[in-house]
Design a protein with these regions (language model features):
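Mobile "lid/hinge" segments at catalytic clefts and subdomain interfaces of large enzymes
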Residues: 1-4, 12, 16-18, 38-97, ...
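Glycine-/charge-enriched secondary-structure boundary and capping motifs
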Residues: 4-18, 23, 27-42, 91, ...
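A general structural motif
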Residues: 48-51, 96-106, 146-152
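Short C-terminal domain-edge/linker segments immediately following a structured domain
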Residues: 76, 99-102, 197-200
Length: 212
């Protein structure tokens, strides 16, 4: 029960910081089996409005040569992650919650979308960057080339579920404007891939690459 109470307190803190209304929710303590408590994960409903649905940002990338960025900082945080679940691993650090950074990320993504800079985007909360780009490639049926940024362990980069991060795909013509906007707001933006339908797009990166 303590874990559940802490989870709802965290939800309240996040709603206040981000200005998000919760329209409904559900949890049943009658689902407890024997001595095993239910997971402290309430289900909540949140309503969002897009003023013009034609301006929505899809998950699937489309343009050959479009640049793939990861926004935010990645840390060695695997407790409670999909990797930990699949490996049956207990231990390590859970992703640290940074609500001001989450708000900043949301503001940047919305602003960039309104300005027509972003052609696709995806969260990395369910499996990390590696899972996210695979889902984007499968949705688009178009591959891409990737490289691991310097000064970070490849495993951490691909599978960490650090918060306040998102993948943004932009046309090459928007790279300068997008980078300057992120820098001006204090958001790290790291280019780590390029969309490649198989025509041999030059990634512009000399290091070892992975093709998805």
């Amino acid at each position: 029960m303590w874990q559940f109470a802490q989870a709802t307190t965290g939800l309240a803190d996040a709603c206040l910081e981000l200005g998000i209304p919760v329209t409904g929710g559900n949890v049943s303590f009658y689902n407890q089996t024997g001595e095993n408590a239910i997971s402290p994960t309430p289900v909540v409903g949140v309503l969002g409005v897009i003023n013009n649905v034609e301006h929505r940002t899809p998950m699937a990338w489309a343009g050959d040569g479009d640049l793939i960025y990861i926004l935010g900082d990645t840390a060695d945080e695997f407790a409670g992650s999909e990797w930990a679940h699949l490996q049956g691993h207990l231990g390590g650090l859970p992703p640290k919650v940074d609500l001001p950074a989450e708000r900043l990320l949301s503001e940047i993504m919305v602003a960039a979308s309104h300005e027509g800079m972003i052609t696709a985007a995806h969260d990395v909360s369910d499996g990390g960057v590696g899972v996210a780009v695979t889902e984007m490639a499968l949705r688009a049926n178009i591959g891409a080339r990737f490289w691991i940024p310097e000064n970070i362990d490849p495993f951490v980069f691909l599978f960490s579920e650090s918060t306040a991060r998102a993948i943004a795909v932009i046309p090459g013509t928007e790279e300068l404007r997008f980078s300057e906007m992120c820098a001006a707001r204090g958001m790290r933006a790291t280019r780590f891939g390029v969309v490649d339908s198989g025509l041999g797009v030059n990634s512009g990166h000399p290091g070892e690459q992975v093709i998805v």
